[in-house]
Amino acid sequence: YIFAGWTIYAAMKHPYFSNPMIYLPLILLGIDKIYKKQKPYVFIWSVALAGLSNFYFFYMLGIFMVLYAIFRYFDLFADRSIKNIGKWLGVFAVYSVIAVLIAAVILLPVILPVFGTDRFKAENYVPLFYDRIYYEKYLGCLIGENMIQWGVAGYTAVSLAGVFVLFSKKKKYTALKAGFVLLNVFLLLPYAGHVLNGLSYVSNRWIWAYGMLIAYIFVKIYPELFALTLTEKRKVFVMLLIYCILALLPEAARTQRNLMAMVLLSLSTFTVLSFGNIFTRERNLTVMVAGFLIAGILFNMHYQYSYEKDYLSEFTDSGEALEKLETGVDRAVLSTDDPSVYRYDQMDTNSSENSSMQMGTNSTAYYFSVASSSIANFFDEMYLNTPWEQHYNNLDGRTILDRLASVKYFVVKKGKESDLPYGYFRLSGEAEKNGKTYLAYADEDALPLGYTYDSWISREDYDKMTVTEKQQALLQGVVLDDSSLPETETHFNDREVSYYTSEGKGCRLKNGKVVVTQENAQLKLVFEGEENAETYLITEGLDYEGLSPREMISDKKWSKMTTYEQNKLL
């Protein structure tokens, strides 16, 4: 459970992704204690800690908590009357409410903004099924390769041998069998990934719970390894044969990692089947099973962190993380020795998102899963190119937006002073890092962090304005649905300039369309620029269909590629 693929891959990338793995066993233990009519403290505090820890995984834990309680009830009790079910439902409801109330001090302030985000309210496309290649590689990926959509199973081969033994047992372990089938159905249907991901995009980040089931199955089945009948051994052998054939039948699944996983699975299964025939000492089987368990863990780690997979390149080298967070941009701002409260903006400085949290500054960059929908709506109105509402770097170098956001300093690299927006004339701070010099220029007319308006603009009038008019209007009046303030007399000085298009490298114009024929294509727009002005390029109605990597390669070239090259491309 601890060394499944989720830990090896996901928990290393995001350490808090291991939190649900900590709380799940405790919650399940608490459920068992309640069914045994023992004190509910383990359940209440485990649920409360899970809620305090992370709302995202708390949602998933809640679903699996309910599923486990249902399966466990039908496994333990013969009385399945509505009255008895209702009694236990009430008991768990009371204890769950107590736990949520304990966690509410942190859970509510975090979860309430989530419901207002566009990310939560977005209508995500959920296909009925995954692509064919997902199903072709599915069986092998349980103990081999990583699946798509965060389906990082990576279970040891010996644990799957335990599953074979489980299904060889007739009229036993019904709840475990049903749970195993159910979670596999969840992995096979995109809609399950949609629901378990908070009704957002399809993602199988719940797969750590599947790892708990696999581990629990093996622990329950372990004593059975020493008492298999001949009939049961035959069933296990047939299941092994069917699994290996189906897992390796598709050509796309025949990767080195999957093949090695099948070898380990076969060896561990044959070891279990050999007990009682080739060797009879229980200690020998115990040592060999432990050996295959360790070998499976090391095998998964080796492939995940291999040079070919190059997973380690996504991380910062040991001892360099703090150095990366202490960016030259923040150092330049801090060198101003300005004690007031202000924000800074930057352009093309390669600064790290959220470095301000480490450095004690206030920037216009942001990267966190929970983002205010009001900010996202404002960015949409201003045509700010931020593909993710929860991830943005700057305010596009626009003077007006910087003023509205109380930006006092703008940072650029030395030699890139041409990137400075209007108004930043005085050099106030300077810092050097890694051979590069960062310059912080001050805006003498910066607005304070808090400011007021003396007139208002109706939302109806504001919505009719163009984007350039909107940002000018916000400097003159506040947008409200109604107010007793005087109405703003807006004044605009923007204008459109004439231009013509010229075909560039890798594209051509045809019937009102831009036809792109190669990567990094260029279309030239030729115009006379205005002096002492910001120039905006606004594109509207520019729609296109995505192109898959396969469509970029001719059939002739595709046929000459190896399976490995094709899989790597896809």
Question: What kind of feature is each model-predicted range?
Answer:
Residues 1-76, 88-111, 116, 186-187, ...:
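Membrane-embedded helix bundles of polyisoprenyl
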Residues 2-28, 35, 51-61, 145-159, ...:
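Membrane-interface micro-motifs in multi-pass membrane enzymes
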Residues 19, 58-68, 120, 126-130, ...:
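Aromatic- and carboxylate-enriched substrate-binding clefts and catalytic-loop regions
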Residues 23-29, 60-71, 99, 103, ...:
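Hydrophobic cores of alpha-helical transmembrane segments in multi-pass inner/ER membrane proteins
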Residues 38, 57, 175-191, 197-324:
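Contiguous transmembrane helix-bundle modules in multi-pass membrane proteins
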Residues 76-89, 229-235:
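Membrane-interfacial, low-structure loops and terminal tails that flank and connect transmembrane helices
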Residues 88-179, 183-204, 251-257:
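Periplasmic/ER-lumenal interhelical loops and adjacent helix-loop junctions
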Residues 288-570:
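Soluble catalytic regions of membrane-associated enzymes that act on cell-envelope
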